[in-house]
Amino acid sequence: MSENILTEPPRSDADNEGYVDRKRHLWILSVLWPATPIIGLYLVSQTGWSIWYGLVLILWYGLVPLIDTMLGEDYSNPPESVVPKLEQDRYYKVLTYLTVPIHYAALIISAWWVSTQPIGVFEFLALALSLGIVNGLALNTGHELGHKKETFDRWMAKLVLAVVGYGHFFIEHNKGHHRDVATPMDPATSRMGESIYTFSLREIPGAFKRAWGLEEQRLSRCGKSVWSLDNEVLQPMILTVVLYAALLAFFGPLMLIFLPIQMAFGWWQLTSANYIEHYGLLREKLPNGRYEHQKPHHSWNSNHVMSNLILFHLQRHSDHHAHPTRSYQSLRDFSDLPTLPTGYPGMFFVAFFPSWFRSLMDDRVMEWAHGDINKIQIQPGMREFYEQKFGVKGSESPDTTVAK
């Protein structure tokens, strides 16, 4: 990956103050997306067709990737001269706030439906998985708000993360993943040749362990117990316990099945995102033993239109990692970034099939590394396979140090 990415200005629509965000009103799609399970239930009530229980599944894994293919990519950027104005425009932040009660509404209405309406096993499962997808993407809202410094924003992040029971993301992502990304120390960075299933077994427990350890260290410095209510991992966990206990009390024992299914599939959405966002990428280890500062080319990027519009621009992940506090409406594309072949929903689906995923991504990783296999994070035991596949020879002792 060439270094001119650090010096070339990003592409912009216009270098003047007359810039208009053409997607300004389209961002409402990110707000409406969490309501899709409710829309599906309305369609079931009006038509009697069970297929609508799986509306989110159909849209997420089918229609959205199709629209991404049809619409292609949007490379336009706001000129830097208007970014301060965009960042101060409350409209964009209000949209993120609005998604929070919608996530709660989708959860409560779905819980009410399965406990009061006649529903078969497959319909039950389809609704639980559909809810899991949109509530997994509550993590996306929590991601956007959790990077902000305002107390209100940070509490809104904790509230929305509580919906899917993944409150430790608030600490793990900001203080752990952003520090260690694209290094062997990061459980949320996948290795070339690693399947999503293998990745999940180290990413999910590794994320919680890192978050808890970071909070334990912070509270210790403040002279407080890790079990203090100041623990920002415990805070959203308590919210989840209260929320789920209330749902169980109101809607009965079916919640003991329904809630874990939607929660598990919600967690799977984050695992899928982490899996594709930095697959195989590696920051250079410097002579002093530290890793180079992360740059835009240490994240896979996607400019696909439809999926970005329902994900608050999450797929412009390269600029996000380089500038974590930059809001979604201001995120930029750069020249010469590592690029995913399609948007996140399509890549999430492909990731279910490891051979298919590797066939799409491994050549891209090698191209990113300019054919130098030593610049790639590779799954242990797979190095010889890739040396033979690409006809290259790596060093005898590649850096595979993993934090304990």
Curated annotation (Swiss-Prot):
It is an enzyme of class 1 (oxidoreductase). Fe cation 1 binds at residues 143, 147, 173, 177. Fe cation 2 binds at residues 178, 317, 320-321. Induction: Induced by AlkS and n-alkanes. It is a multi-pass membrane protein. Pathway: Hydrocarbon metabolism; alkane degradation. GO terms for biological process: alkane catabolic process; lipid metabolic process. The keyword Transmembrane applies. InterPro entries: AlkB/XylM, FA_desaturase_dom. It holds the Pfam family FA_desaturase. Binds 2 Fe(3+) ions per subunit. Keywords: Cell inner membrane, Cell membrane, Iron, Membrane, Metal-binding, Monooxygenase, Oxidoreductase, Transmembrane, Transmembrane helix. GO terms for cellular component: plasma membrane. GO terms for molecular function: alkane 1-monooxygenase activity; metal ion binding. Its EC number is 1.14.15.3. Its cofactor is Fe(3+). It is found in: Cell inner membrane. Its main location: membrane. The chain crosses the membrane at residues 25-45, 47-67, 94-114, 119-139, 151-171, 241-261. It catalyses: octane + 2 reduced [rubredoxin] + O2 + 2 H(+) = 2 oxidized [rubredoxin] + octan-1-ol + H2O. Belongs to the fatty acid desaturase type 1 family. AlkB subfamily. Catalyzes the hydroxylation of n-alkanes and fatty acids in the presence of a NADH-rubredoxin reductase and rubredoxin. It preferably hydroxylases C5-C12 hydrocarbons. This is Alkane 1-monooxygenase 1.
